[in-house]
Amino acid sequence: MKKTIIVAVAALALAHVASAQTNLQMFYDFGRGYATTTLEGFYADNWGDTFFFIDHYYATKADRENTGAGTAINGSYFEIERNLNFWKDSPLADLSLHVEYDGATWGAGVACVGVNYFMHSDDFKNIYNVAVMYDHHIGYGSASVPVKFTGVWGMQDIFGVEGLRFSGFIDIWGLDSQFANPDDILHPYETNLTILSEPQIWYNVGKHIGVENLNVGGEVELSLNFAGNHGFMCNPCIGTKWVF
């Protein structure tokens, strides 16, 4: 999952610098041992903004042979979100209505509705986005507590280094899950909460060679009860990002 472009271009839009951005990220996941790509885009207009991303996972031959067809292996996950804001000239300009759909090739689907709040520093270099939503599971999965919280951040030129960016997101949502208990196969672990965070760091190395589209860096996926894994997991990734 990637949401880091949201606050980056939202700040630019408010600063009247740009209203759209599309980028492609390519990662190697050291924890899982395969590559992923992420295509994401943000587009602002007079009625709010639209954001989407598509993650695709490139499994190895061994992964495919040992994993069922209905899983994320060699599959895709996507989110599309819309913030609706018809009051940009009012004191509530930073508060928007939020609708979202999350889906995957392995059957997962969630529709969300809620509110979104945008915050920024005076120079727009440090930006934050918070959304609280009611989520409804479609087809696959259920939630005793059907609530989702999303926080997104972006910090530009950190440590005074031009072109160095720290960004990321955290998702916390209700999801009823069962995990195998190796000590008691008749009583699996049961959880009702999932957490996923992906802090990223990028450096605009391309500015040194006349290609400012190119960034290098990576991310760390931190999760709790996520993607079939009970408990805490940490998956570091190295990657590149091309901004169109």
Model-derived features: positions:
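Cleavable N-terminal export/targeting peptides
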Residues: 1-21
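Membrane-embedded beta-strands of outer-membrane beta-barrel proteins
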Residues: 39, 80, 113-115, 149-153, ...
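Solvent-exposed loop/turn segments connecting transmembrane beta-strands
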Residues: 29-35, 60-74, 101-111, 136-145, ...
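Outer-membrane beta-barrel "beta-signal"
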Residues: 232-244
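Transmembrane beta-barrel domains of Gram-negative outer membranes and organellar outer membranes
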Residues: 23-29, 33-90, 94-100
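Short loop/turn motifs that connect adjacent beta-strands in outer-membrane beta-barrel proteins
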Residues: 20-21, 47-49, 85-96, 120-129, ...
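Transmembrane beta-strands of outer-membrane beta-barrel pores
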Residues: 26-32, 45, 56-60, 99-105, ...
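Outer-membrane beta-barrel transmembrane domain signature
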Residues: 135-215, 221-225, 242-244
